[in-house]
Amino acid sequence: MTNTIAEFLNTRGLSAAAVDVDATLARFQHEMAEGLAGRPISLAMIPAYIGIDKPVPVGKPVIVLDAGGTNLRAALVTFDAAGTSRVEKFSKTAMPGAQGTRATAQDFYNVLAGLLAPLLADADDIGFVFSYPAEITPDCDARLIRWTKQVDMPDLVDAMVGAGLAKALKARGHAKRITVLSDTVATLLAGKSAGISRRYSNYVGLILGTGTNIAYVAPNATITKVKNLPPNGAMTINAETGGFTGVPQTEFDRAFDATTKDTGDYTFEKMISGAYLGGLGRFVLQAGAREGFFSAPAKAALLECASLANKDFDDFCANPFSTGGALGAMPFNDGDRRAVMALGKPVFERAAKLAACNICAAVIQTGGGTDPLHPVCVTIDGSTYYRTKAVNLKSLVEQHVRDILGPRGLYADLIQIDEAPVIGAAVAGLTR
């Protein structure tokens, strides 16, 4: 048996200390460059055809539409001279096809048109956050590649989502300019509203919730897979970093990955995001039980555990006397509780360092942040980043970012904007 839990994890590479920052950054930067050149790598590097050069108009309303979960949401957004948003006439309705019944494209557009009806007289532009796998086109439309999140609406696959909505609205007597974008790109653009009063050199957007992704603004000269771009301009890139394969998997990562429906895919996302950390933690705890770190009753209970939600894992690591969830029901003594904490917290600590590497790679690729007066704005959204209890994940990420960027002479400002995707969609609709 390994002498200590720390030695057990370190010899297997599951710790923040085991993350090779320089190697991880080099792999990220290599794949980002290759992806922008159109070469096949694990990062999709999807051009969003949205820049950041235009100022955000003050006092001009824009309609925002958000489709990405069980609900569709709509609102009217206006910005003041300080970049503060005013959100009005907010409404929501159920997402067609997400309630266990099949829906059609016509159902989808009818529901959208009905949701937007009270807002259509107030603005000419619509910023549409569409958080499903889609190919963004140069006219800021989106071709749906596939549905996720259990949505059942097969006849919309391969269709142009924005054009379909524009047609449905025009049939009702309303001609609108629609800008479609992903939630990650919208999160990045939300920083533009903060940039009205704070002068940033560039922008990054990170989602770290049930899943993860990052977007950043790349110089057009580096985006060689898109022809005839203005050479001196820049464009937002949706990197799709959840699919990054440049971080070596530990034996725990491989064992957990083998149990998922998409084995071998989204391996980076499975190391850092909320949908997967509980499942990964179960394999770590069970390995610790087999290694002899738990009492006999606790070992038996852990080895019989068939699933572990991240909330239960996180809650118990934060408070090992909690009685809720799968771990709270197990016959732990105080030594067992200490073992859960010692085995569990490194899972979250590694996630924080990997997330910081992701951020820093994007900051470096923007070419900005060389002057502390004008740092790169990194807008971060997602429950895993802000609500993890086992460790202060937000503070750990911030410290790692300082440690990584500081010696490189780079500066970043990590910010939170409430309802970032909604605010970013408003910016997109106003500045396209």
Label every model-predicted segment.
Residues G69-T70, F79-A81, P133, G211-N213, ...:
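Conserved beta-strand elements of beta-rich interaction domains across eukaryotes
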